[in-house]
A protein has these predicted regions:
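Flexible loop/turn connectors
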Residues: 17-120
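Short beta-strand elements in bilobed, periplasmic/extracellular small-molecule ligand-binding domains
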Residues: 1-10
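Short acidic active-site motifs
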Residues: 11, 15
Length: 120
């Protein structure tokens, strides 16, 4: 389901309730970020749906709260701490003309932080 650009805990809770109310069978939620996933966990618990026994949930971005929520959220760690300084450095180099790099794809490694919301 689409949340638009509202990627908050509240949006995750509302969208999950809409999905439950739709009657469409599902057994997992892959959320765009951890906040949406935490909202989903809240709504699943409020509806008596057991995680991970009846429903598995995974987020993306490994925010600090994910480890402390009950149950602790399985998430993807995108390892992107380096991206902002790299982007700023490339932009400043281009502005002052010291080094103009050709456009390129920059890739990163991501990995699963398995916690209690999936059966991995």
């Amino acid at each position: 389901m689409n949340t638009g650009q509202d990627w908050t805990i509240g949006s995750g809770a509302r969208i999950t309730q809409q999905l439950i109310d739709s009657g469409i069978p599902f057994d997992g939620i892959v959320a765009f970020n951890d906040q949406l996933a935490l909202g989903a966990l809240f709504t699943l618990a409020a509806n008596g749906i057991s995680v991970p026994d009846q429903m598995q949930v995974i987020g993306f971005d490994n925010i600090e709260e994910a480890a402390y929520f009950q149950p602790p959220l399985t998430t993807m760690d995108s390892c992107l701490d380096w991206i902002a300084p790299t982007a700023v450095s490339r932009i400043l180099d281009r502005i002052d003309g010291t080094r103009v790099l050709e456009p390129s794809y920059i890739t990163t490694q991501s990995h699963v932080i398995a916690r209690a919301t999936t059966r991995v």
